[in-house]
Amino acid sequence: MSADKFYIEKELSWLSFNERVLQEAADKTVPLIERIRFLGIFSNNLDEFYKVRFSDVKRRILINREQGGNDISKHLLSKMQSKALKLNERFDELYNELIRDMARRHIFLVNESQLDEAQQKWIIKYFQKEVLPHITPLMLTDEIDVLQFLKDEYAYIAVELKQQEQAKYALLEIPTDHLPRFIMVPEQKGKRKKTIILLDNIIRFCLNDIFRGFFDYDELNGYAMKMTRDAEYDLRHEVEYSLLEQMSEGLSQRLTALPVRFVYERDMPEDMLKYLCYKLKISHYDSLIPGGRYHNFKDFIAFPNVGRDYLENKPLPPLACADFEGYANAFDAIRNQDILLHYPYHSFEHITELVRQASFDPKVVSIKINVYRVAKNSRLMNSLIDAVHNGKRVTVVVELQARFDEEANIEWSKLLTDAGVHVIFGVPGMKIHAKLLLITRREEQGFVRYAHIGTGNFHERTARIYTDFSLLTADQELAAEVRGVFSYIMNPFRPIKFRHLIVSPRNSRSQLYRLLDREIHNAQAGKKASITLKVNNLVDKGLISKLYAASSAGVKIRMIIRGMCSLVPGLEGISENIEIISIIDRFLEHPRVLVVHNDGDPQVFISSADWMERNIDNRIEVMSPVRDARIKQRIIDILSIQFTDTVKARRIDKEMSNNYVERGNRKKIRSQIAIYDYLKNVEKHTRKQKGQVEPNDNNQ
């Protein structure tokens, strides 16, 4: 905890979140292949931590050094490094444990020294045909600025070519852009065992085939390494350059940014390590981490199953939403009543189908959507292009600064513009993180607007693994305000008022304060008062102070926080009425929801915004009331199920101990599975009421 005992540093809280991910890899009740994939998720998270959080603290240190500041950031950086090293040590222990567990199931992840003669012959052939064409050594000399050529977050093999007392060094990029990281080695017929080798080890086995005939050496050794660069970039914000041009330049900056982490194989010779640090300009503020033979463990997210179903999670087929059934089109269904989709339990196909129908429906005159992250081959985006071809007015607000998706969004922007879509890049200096879709139809009574307000991205792939809400409504008051958000994006200086939607940066802080203050006043008046909050991150000090005030006034507060949480629960007289859990399971918890008791007339809101200063004050975010009583109760039920979790819920406390919620005599409840069953029953009940046939699970 910081000197201010009321707040946990967000960077340390983030590492505590990633420790919860590592707990899933350690959990023996999780299927084996899924445990290995959690190692990949942990590693991918840690890569992003160094690119973003670590880099930010390092920059603060350098600024303080230039301006004569204090050592607070240095102290924080030291704590971050210490915690990250401990997590890496635990990671290595778990990796070795999982390798042994796989071997007990006749699955072997082998290195180059464990191959039999037949396997060696197969490996040599595979290398010559598939791998060697993608290998070009980068020889390290004093004249070459290797920092210009080394790719961020790529795994390399650093090669030592020794001849007597002299040594030359070279770098080999492991070509995972062209080849799979995991290679199945054929076995003799009738053998039960499955053998997998990493591409890294195939290259190690064939090092001589790369260098022989070009260099003289007595000994050849390879060592794993990886470098992480600072992910930030500066935009010039100059009038003569478009945002698209500025972003392209910014991404070029990222390609050559200075390193913030260097991970190397711990057996690497000292002279070689010193030379690489010199060539890569590694400073003492950067993180130098000794590791094992393999880096870029994020690739383990895609670790292959070898044909044994029990080693993976049982599939949960996405549910078809019965509210759409029995209507000629999606618009008739939405006009009849508001519809709530909860991914990945519900199929995202409902959204792609809605946009597909809008693309050719003769009544549709316009489509507006804002895009933060989308799939590479997005059907939804292609439907928007089809809509333009069919004469619809299509406006797409593309967020070019969606971190690590910038290149994909630039490419989509070009494709959409070429097709005739009106592409807008939003408000300078302010990310657009809202999840809005607005479709306008010309109907008998005039123009009718249909709106989507969501907590997650329009991304077909992540909708299968992220939990999120989509609210579809023909409520003309809400739809008019969604139209107002698009107007605000196009002209942020034009005065506009929102009576129903809560929109960052216009009124989010004041409206959230108003909602929390009302619960405080009700508690002080002796009335029942409660707040239920679910977000990814809670770090905004102003909102945390309000929550402390609410707790002190007697408001009962329950929260589900997946990631960073700077609020300290359980402080005497300050946060005793605050209970916080975090759920890490097969799906990534992503919705933002607020429920306030409101003197017995609960108000429910869904939002795109986390409770962070950037989201409340410096981004365009949308929080919407849920007005349909049926849907309000459904969201409250889902949150209630999560608070009964006795399998995957951890308590958030001031020590960041990540203890699982005590089960006691209660039965096991795994909330994600329980929510799936709950929604399945909801759909079954809806079909029964409508007299419709239950679909076959295989078709859901």
UniProtKB/Swiss-Prot annotation:
Q: What does this protein do?
A: Catalyzes the reversible transfer of the terminal phosphate of ATP to form a long-chain polyphosphate (polyP).
Q: Where is the active site?
A: H433 (phosphohistidine intermediate)
A GO BP entry is: polyphosphate biosynthetic process
PROSITE patterns (alphabetical): PLD (PS50035)
CC terms in the record's Gene Ontology section? polyphosphate kinase complex
Q: Which family does it belong to?
A: Belongs to the polyphosphate kinase 1 (PPK1) family.
Q: What is its EC number?
A: 2.7.4.1
- Keywords on record: ATP-binding, Kinase, Magnesium, Metal-binding, Nucleotide-binding, Phosphoprotein, Repeat, Transferase
Q: Which organism is it from?
A: Vibrio vulnificus (strain CMCP6)
Q: Which cofactor does it need?
A: Mg(2+)
Name the SUPFAM superfamilies on file: Phospholipase D/nuclease, PHP14-like, PPK N-terminal domain-like
Q: What is this protein called?
A: Polyphosphate kinase
- Top enzyme class of this protein? transferase
Report domain PLD phosphodiesterase positions: 428-462, 585-615
